[in-house]
């Protein structure tokens, strides 16, 4: 699988620029490219699941890690083995109106994005409750050495290499002020992104399965023209 070293060599060979100054800039090219990919892709490969203990002490501001970009889903179980309950997403204003007294407790029903680094859950749970948060997150940063926040390979390098490579070339070409070639890499990047978006759509298609109610029983869902 392609890793940081592979990508670095590929960039140097493609640009035919083996200068020390260029090599020093490569980590910055990669960082900017990864940020671009996270914004341009809607891919299940970016999804992460995190379990967080929620209680009266933090229900008003449940922390999210700094790589979270989108909160997709929040659910919980009252105790082990019980049915999973999905919380409904609402605005902060709605949550505050619905449950104005945070000291009061009840069964969690709603969540809202409070800031870029936290969500609010209401009602405040009666006791500590484990909540599973599904998020679209920035993968750990690709770098030459491993650590708590970096890795030599990640989802982009392993499954989206062409898009990552062309995105890096856009940054490299901007750095070298090669305006004519810049349009070539931008075009190649868009082609790679469209391919990945099509792949993402294919993961969500139902392959012509008959629409049915998730609750089971008689089918209450009808399709247009049926």
Stretches with model-predicted labels:
Residues 1-226:
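Glycine-enriched, solvent-exposed interface loops adjoining structured elements
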């Amino acid at each position: 699988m392609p890793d940081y070293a592979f990508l670095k060599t590929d960039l140097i060979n493609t640009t035919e620029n083996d200068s020390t100054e260029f090599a020093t800039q490569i980590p910055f090219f990669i960082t900017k490219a990864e940020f671009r990919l996270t914004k341009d892709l809607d891919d299940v490969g970016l999804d992460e699941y995190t379990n967080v203990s929620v209680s009266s002490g933090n229900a008003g501001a449940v922390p999210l890690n700094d790589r979270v970009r989108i909160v997709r889903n929040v659910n919980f179980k009252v105790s082990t083995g019980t049915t999973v309950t999905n919380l409904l997403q609402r605005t902060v204003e709605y949550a505050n109106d619905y449950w104005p007294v945070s000291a009061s407790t009840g069964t969690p029903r709603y969540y809202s994005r409070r800031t870029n680094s936290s969500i609010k859950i209401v009602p405040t749970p009666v006791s500590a409750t484990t909540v599973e948060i599904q998020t679209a997150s920035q993968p750990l940063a690709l770098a030459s050495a491993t650590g708590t926040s970096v890795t030599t390979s990640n989802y982009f390098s392993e499954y989206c290499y062409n898009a990552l490579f062309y995105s890096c070339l856009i940054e490299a070409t901007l750095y070298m002020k090669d305006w004519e070639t810049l349009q070539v890499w931008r075009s190649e990047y868009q082609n790679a992104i469209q391919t990945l978006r099509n792949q993402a759509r294919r993961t969500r298609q139902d392959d012509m399965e008959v629409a049915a109610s998730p609750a089971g029983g008689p089918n209450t869902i009808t399709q247009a023209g049926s």
